[in-house]
């Protein structure tokens, strides 16, 4: 199982409290189910994207000031692509990750690790 969380579940971003709380709950559910279902051979992981270029984000990213703010907070200095999230999900479904469970993989260009 691969859940789709968000960096909002791990730190404050301007998506609102309800969104952040729901993603934090999903991250915790991932960890708990990974432990509960491990004996049955079920792995449960999560991906946590930061800014990903999609139809939903295109309007916000079209604003040069907002785009610059996103880039300034992203060590890789770019937004992610949907294919990169899909590749992370695919990895978590492959035998190559057979010993990985309970993890929330940030697909965020380093956003969660970036300090001031």
Where are these regions (language model features)?
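A conserved structural motif in NAD(P)-dependent oxidoreductases
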Residues: 74-85
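Short C-terminal tail/terminal secondary-structure segment
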Residues: 11, 90, 101-116
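Alpha-helical segment proximal to the catalytic Tyr-Lys
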Residues: 35-39, 98
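Residue(s) in the substrate-gating loop at a strand-loop-helix junction
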Residues: 6
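Short, flexible catalytic-loop segment of classical short-chain dehydrogenase/reductase
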Residues: 10, 27, 44, 48-59
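Active-site helix of classical SDR
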Residues: 22, 30
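A glycine/serine/threonine-rich, flexible loop-to-helix segment
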Residues: 39, 51-74, 114-116
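Active-site "substrate specificity/gating" loop of NAD(P)-dependent dehydrogenases
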Residues: 12-16, 38, 116
């Amino acid at each position: 199982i691969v859940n789709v969380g968000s960096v909002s579940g791990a730190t404050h971003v301007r998506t609102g409290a309800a969104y952040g709380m729901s993603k934090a709950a999903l991250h915790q559910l991932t960890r708990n189910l990974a432990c509960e279902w491990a004996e049955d051979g079920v792995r449960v992981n999560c991906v946590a994207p930061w800014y990903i270029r999609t139809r939903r984000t295109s309007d916000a990213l079209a604003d040069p000031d907002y785009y610059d703010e996103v880039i300034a907070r992203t060590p890789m200095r770019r937004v992610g692509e949907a294919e990169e999230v899909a590749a992370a999900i695919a990895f978590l479904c492959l035998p190559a990750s057979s010993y990985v469970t309970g993890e929330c993989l940030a697909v965020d260009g380093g956003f969660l690790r970036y300090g001031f």
